[in-house]
């Protein structure tokens, strides 16, 4: 097995070590292997391939980090073909929340989410994706 080196803030490393202890992992390497597998499999859901999808991406960052807001604006324009809507709000006193509503293929949405994740100084990134053509029980009600 290869050995790799990763740079990260001390606070994050402490949280990972605590997570490993709390959940019975043998060490942080096991946590990183599982997290890496999950990340790689995240957009490999065969049920979503070749379907039109809708998605929501939420990004939270500190108000002082204007480079994040600039990057969000750049990504919004770069991916205007899939960004159906975008909302910016100030929350919690000194944080900003950017919300993107997306419509596109699995590949285009995963590319967008990947670029958001690669943005430095974000505090949290969350998203969800649903097929446009399948609303399950909701579709049957109409």
Swiss-Prot record:
Organism: Haloquadratum walsbyi (strain DSM 16790 / HBSQ001)
Binding site for Ni(2+): 77, 88, 90, 96
Coiled coil regions in record: none
Keywords in alphabetical order: DNA-binding, Metal-binding, Nickel, Transcription, Transcription regulation
Name of a matching Pfam family: NikR_C
Cofactor note: Binds 1 nickel ion per subunit.
GO annotation, biological process: response to nickel cation
Annotated function: Transcriptional regulator.
Protein name from the UniProt record: Putative nickel-responsive regulator
InterPro entries (UniProt xref): Acetolactate_synth/TF_NikR_C, ACT-like_dom_sf, Arc_rbn_hlx_hlx, CopG, CopG/NikR_regulator, Ni_resp_reg_NikR, Ribbon_hlx_hlx, TF_NikR_Ni-bd_C
């Amino acid at each position: 097995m290869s050995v790799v080196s990763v740079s990260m803030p001390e606070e994050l490393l402490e949280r990972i070590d605590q997570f490993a202890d709390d959940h019975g992992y043998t060490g942080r390497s096991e946590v990183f292997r599982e997290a890496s597998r999950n990340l790689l499999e995240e957009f490999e859901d065969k049920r979503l391939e070749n379907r039109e999808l809708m998605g929501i991406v939420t990004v939270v960052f500190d108000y002082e980090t204007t480079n994040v807001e600039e990057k969000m604006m750049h990504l919004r324009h770069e991916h205007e073909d899939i960004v159906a809507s975008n909302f910016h709000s100030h929350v919690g006193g000194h944080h900003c929340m950017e919300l993107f509503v997306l419509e596109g293929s699995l590949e285009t949405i995963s590319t967008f989410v990947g670029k958001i994740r690669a943005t430095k100084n974000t505090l949290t990134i969350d998203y969800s994706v649903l097929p446009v053509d399948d609303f399950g029980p909701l579709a049957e009600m109409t």
